Amino acid sequence: RPPRSTLLPYTTLFRSGLTTTEGLRVRTGLLFRAGYLCDLDGPDRDALDSLGIRTILDLRRPTEVAARPHPEMDGVEIVQASVSSDDNEFAVLANAMLDPDSEPLGPDHIAAYFRGNVTDRLDRYRSVFETATDPGRYPLLFNCTAGKDRTGFVAGILLRMLGVDERTVLDDYMLSNVVRREWIAEREVEHRQRIAESLGIGPDEVPETRLVASRALLNCARSFLRAALDAVHDGWGSWEAFRRDGLGISDDRFAAYRDALLA
């Protein structure tokens, strides 16, 4: 079984049974996504080692890596590729959503963040996709802290470039809510308590608008990733144009990626 961390179970990026619109089967066991890895021990660490990971592609900022460094793994290359600015846009958004002195934000703001990955921050992701589409680095695991926002965006783009239809890609993205169900429930309680303390009220008195913001932060929503996919369509018109002109992935690199992942 996939190993579990205290934050997010590892997931093979490509679930068994995924197919492209051309009817090709997507291979599993080559790309994985996860949250932070430092808490793994015992059987979970053994399971991670059994995956034969060759490359870890870390999307976190240096401060996140320092707080939760990678475990020692023999023969594994760690590629640091922070996709966040020093201001860490998502953390700023998260803090604003939970700040009692600010206007409550909601799911639309996270969807706008995802769209901005394509319209405003794509340059930070180009090296990520260049690495993730290199079969010479497989098996490859890419991770962030929560394993759902930065990695969820990358996973969705990788699948759509392969030709998996949008509905299936969104279904795959939403699995993060399933595998993180217990963790989400625990964090919702913590968020409610934190908001209550900051407002000077009891947990049962927290306004629904604040709880909506909390749930939006902790859960995946189809509208989040769809916003990014729509931005690709709006800006480039096709996945081939986006791959070539937006991400700068050459025809030869993309052909090698397809050959490795499709059967």
Which sequence ranges carry the predicted segments?
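Short cysteine clusters
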Residues: 144
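Cys-dependent protein tyrosine phosphatase-like superfamily
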Residues: 8-141, 154-263
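Substrate/cofactor-recognition hotspot
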Residues: 147
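Short, exposed "boundary/linker" segments that immediately precede the start
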Residues: 1-6
